[in-house]
Every structure is written in structure tokens, then in C-alpha cells.
Amino acid sequence: MPTLPRLLLTAVLSFSLCLPGFAAKEVEFVKGERSASDLEQDVDRKGQQVLELVDLKPGMVVADVLGGGGYYSELIAEKIAPYGRVYLHNNRAYLPHVGKEVAARLKDNRLENVIRHDRETDDLAFIDQSLDMIFFILGYHDIYHVDKNWKIDRDDFIRQLKTALKPGGHLLIIDHSAPDGSGTKYSQDLHRIDKAYVISELKQKGFKLIKESDLLVNDKDSREISPFHPDIRRKTDRFILLFQK
């Protein structure tokens, strides 16, 4: 039988691997070039195609909420340059796993319009009506995850996102699909959430669904195993939802 320390370590590693941008090895970044790691992730994350689904324009102000190592922040930064800004947000729980990558990505002002924004989820500290768009990638299920050092006040968190958006601003959600009708049943252990549940919840909070995409759909995913199972890692069935305030 596994010892308690081993069980705790397994739990910590499982949660760590769920963080967007989590990487087991250090990544090298060069100014003016995208990293080999990011280019490798493009194959399955299809970041460039995702950005084509949203109306990013130069000068916009965007938040990459719980943005992990900053894969999307860098893509966004290029689209909204030269005068736009991206806030790459992470909280204390994420930083032990992505902090080195964030620091390397932003070192020596490599991305001049990306601002590191380390804040807890109960105080995101975005100025009211200051954001044109929020990216929330592979993290929505985490607002239903409860652990010793992780519990989010969902209503307050969503309220903060909505308050930070300008009138007509957009919220982009991408997450690992759970079986239809399962709600949040799979959020705790399998890090997935039912698309219909997310749509219903955000509509109740005053958001309007304006676009869906099947860009990241994978019918071979049973949606009943962890996104980090070797058979499905980085190839999960994922939904893409664009909401408007």
C-alpha cells in the first residue's frame, strides 16, 4: 500500500500537471523568436488558429488569467502590438510550477508589452472596465477544484472578471470536455468540465455566448480519463467558447 507521503506527492504532482504551461524542463527564450517549446505546443494547442477566432486588434488590453507559463500571452502580445498590453496572471499556487518559465519568457524585457501580474484569485486587482478581452485557458474547471491550498470563491471570481471587462468586452474559455450532462462531476479528479454547464453558468452571470468552435474537438477522447494520461495528453477533446459582457 502506498505510504501517506507518496499519496500526497502524487496528489501534488497531479495538480501541478494541470496548470497551463506546466513544464518539467527549463525553456530557453530568445528575443524576437518563439521558443522551440512553444512551436512544439502549436501542433496540439493550435494557438494561432485560436487567435483567429477572436477579434484582437492593436492597442487592446488583454488579461491571460491563470495563464501559466505564458504561451498565449506571447501570441496575444504580437497581435496587439505595439501599444496594446497583456497581463500575464498567475497566483501563488501556480508560481512554483510556472514561475521559472514566466521569468525566462519575460527576461530582459523580451516581451515589452507583457506585464507580469501575480495576484490571488480573491483580489485580481484589475481596474474596472479596463480590459478588452480575457483569456481563461484550461482553467475554468479549477474554480471547482478544492484542495488544501486551493479553493476559489467562484461567484466572486467570475464577478471580478466581468467587472474588469469593458462594456462589450470578450471572455474566451477553453477547457477539457467532460461527458455531456456531467456538470462539474469530473472537475475535481479528472480536471474536466461539461461545456453546457459552463455556458449555463456564465449566461446566469450576465454573459452572452457569441461563438463556439470545434477547432480542438477530438472524438477519440472518451472524456472520462485525465488530460494527463499518456494516451490523451495534449490531445484532449476541448471546447472553445467566446462570451461577451
Predicted regions and their residues:
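Conserved class I S-adenosyl-L-methionine
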Residues: 59-68
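A short acidic, Gly/Pro-enriched loop at the edge of an enzyme's catalytic core
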Residues: 124-138
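Conserved Class I S-adenosyl-L-methionine
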Residues: 183-210
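Short glycine-dipeptide loop
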Residues: 59, 82-84, 165-171
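Core SAM-dependent methyltransferase catalytic element
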Residues: 205, 220-245
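A short glycine-rich, Lys/Arg-flanked "PGG" loop and its adjoining helix->strand segment in the class I
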Residues: 77-78, 149-167
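S-adenosyl-L-methionine
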Residues: 98-124
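Class I SAM-dependent methyltransferase Rossmann-like catalytic core
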Residues: 26-53, 57
